[in-house]
Amino acid sequence: MHVIAVDAMGGDNAPQAIVEGVNQALAEFKDIEIQLYGDEAKIKNYLTANERVSIVHTDEKINSDDEPVKAIRKKKKASMVLGAQAVKEKAADAVISAGNTGALLAAGLFVVGRIKGVERPGLMSTMPSFTGQPFDMLDLGANAENTANHLHQYAILGSFYAKNVRGIATPRVGLLNNGTEKTKGDSLRKEAFELLSKEASINFIGNVEAREIMSGAADVVVADGFTGNAVLKAIEGTGLGTMKTLKSAIMNGGLKAKLGAFLLKDRLKGMKETMDYSSAGGAVLFGLKAPVVKCHGSSDAKAVYYTIKQVRKMLDTKVVEQLVDAFDPKEEVN
Amino acid sequence: MHVIAVDAMGGDNAPQAIVEGVNQALAEFKDIEIQLYGDEAKIKNYLTANERVSIVHTDEKINSDDEPVKAIRKKKKASMVLGAQAVKEKAADAVISAGNTGALLAAGLFVVGRIKGVERPGLMSTMPSFTGQPFDMLDLGANAENTANHLHQYAILGSFYAKNVRGIATPRVGLLNNGTEKTKGDSLRKEAFELLSKEASINFIGNVEAREIMSGAADVVVADGFTGNAVLKAIEGTGLGTMKTLKSAIMNGGLKAKLGAFLLKDRLKGMKETMDYSSAGGAVLFGLKAPVVKCHGSSDAKAVYYTIKQVRKMLDTKVVEQLVDAFDPKEEVN
């Protein structure tokens, strides 16, 4: 039985979307048990599952504008913090929240804790591509600054994830750089390139450019947290902006445009589904002693369900335990 | 009279697109004179203008896969190098090429030369936004590594450009960062934020995120070359990929989808025009003693025409001379 702690109070649609996602997941997966942290009365309004589920009541919660580190230190009874605490005390195997990202990162680092040997856990998401074949990218912004050694570790972390959770036998690992030639980049990239080239446990395919990552250039894309965050946001901003512009072009285009859009509806929907990656689950703060996963703040019940499914897969495949072994200093060849 | 040196042999559609663009520009602007560098016989195939134009024949040219610095050192008679040389010798006021970007940057730095006081010229483009109001961004990758002082200079450079060439009275200058709060970012960003906050000659509006830059967050976006390059490529990859996916959804969607697309044609075209920024001209290696401007490698005659128009505006407004004054150490307050 996998025990998953869920922060019922985090995100724009909490607790309804969270609890409904939990209902769905409990109905489908018989090998999971859910602990819901939050306002008991409010949770009960939506909870239909009655097996393998418990509520841990608390009035306290972390708000989206709370200062992350301060919040997890001061609000010891917040739903998110109690969930992380349960993982620390081995009462739960993993924790999920759709709340304040920074606070969840802080709870992950300071409450759940790093795997021994992992210097700086990275935030990793499975991102969509135009080819229909998603890719994992990290660090997406857990760190503002990274060293080449961190990037080296991200390559190993991402490769483990793609292999275990996404079932890719030999994930192609690429280093995000400003050109594909091996001599490209700043000193950080040059140093990281050397380290990745020598790393026998991964399939390093060299540098990849931000223009190509959404067209299947690699299965795992390694970036420092600053650049990874900027690229993620550039992709989001461009994608959302394009869709919004298309929509307003249709809405302001009169009857002809509306009829055209109606005829194209199925195709646009199919396109949207290709680009929708909520089925891949949430963003993992990877390199911690247990899965700590962030659902998007605007998650609906489906997205919560998929994140639970993702966490279950992480627990099933024991990807974290494998990482603990891989990073154990005793195992190091050097 | 503004004398503009044009590399007739650079880019995918050279020399035809280049020469046709020159024909258009010469017909419209009576105050410019063009020097075309390249294969005289081939140029003459397309040249219809016969006033204020001259051809400087050379057999040599820089290829797209030539190693930039080596190429400009070894191929002294290459069309691009001769154009830059003409600027150095004051025989021309500016140089334009659609050829090898790295080689043009090298020719700019080593042949034309930096403005005294500008440490690292930056590559700057006027980029489209969903609001229809474009923005200037630099450095887009002339440098793999930058210091806070370089970013400080980019803010001044970009502001001068937006003011003079784009006619924005008080350009809003934003620092590309991983959050909008002033405490965000790595040490480079924090240091740059301090410098920009104290810079009286610009209208610094604080940090901007990559998600918002295409929605009108700032008129000038300041980035280090590595991040700027990655964000530019992420925007390009997402934009092109979305359009390609939309196209193939329509093409494979049968008669219904094709009819829908037909009805939407005008609207999609309008949208494409909003996002098309070739009318803003090429990418300027800004901070040099004269305008050195890169047209996109795939430029058609229209894009070449617009780049000549842009360079003419730069010469008309004397933006480079103003920069020379602004960066003159004698003028510094400190």
Swiss-Prot record, chains A, B:
<protein>
    <recommendedName>
        <fullName>Phosphate acyltransferase</fullName>
        <ecNumber>2.3.1.274</ecNumber>
    </recommendedName>
</protein>
<dbReference type="GO" id="GO:0006633">
    <property type="term" value="P:fatty acid biosynthetic process"/>
</dbReference>
<keyword id="KW-0808">Transferase</keyword>
<keyword id="KW-0594">Phospholipid biosynthesis</keyword>
<comment type="subunit">
    <text>Homodimer. Probably interacts with PlsY.</text>
</comment>
<keyword id="KW-0444">Lipid biosynthesis</keyword>
<dbReference type="InterPro" id="IPR012281">
    <property type="entry name" value="Phospholipid_synth_PlsX-like"/>
</dbReference>
<dbReference type="GO" id="GO:0008654">
    <property type="term" value="P:phospholipid biosynthetic process"/>
</dbReference>
<dbReference type="GO" id="GO:0043811">
    <property type="term" value="F:phosphate:acyl-[acyl carrier protein] acyltransferase activity"/>
</dbReference>
<dbReference type="InterPro" id="IPR003664">
    <property type="entry name" value="FA_synthesis"/>
</dbReference>
<comment type="pathway">
    <text>Lipid metabolism; phospholipid metabolism.</text>
</comment>
<keyword id="KW-0443">Lipid metabolism</keyword>
<keyword id="KW-1208">Phospholipid metabolism</keyword>
<comment type="function">
    <text>Catalyzes the reversible formation of acyl-phosphate (acyl-PO(4)) from acyl-[acyl-carrier-protein] (acyl-ACP). This enzyme utilizes acyl-ACP as fatty acyl donor, but not acyl-CoA.</text>
</comment>
<dbReference type="Pfam" id="PF02504">
    <property type="entry name" value="FA_synthesis"/>
</dbReference>
<comment type="similarity">
    <text>Belongs to the PlsX family.</text>
</comment>
<dbReference type="GO" id="GO:0005737">
    <property type="term" value="C:cytoplasm"/>
</dbReference>
<keyword id="KW-0963">Cytoplasm</keyword>
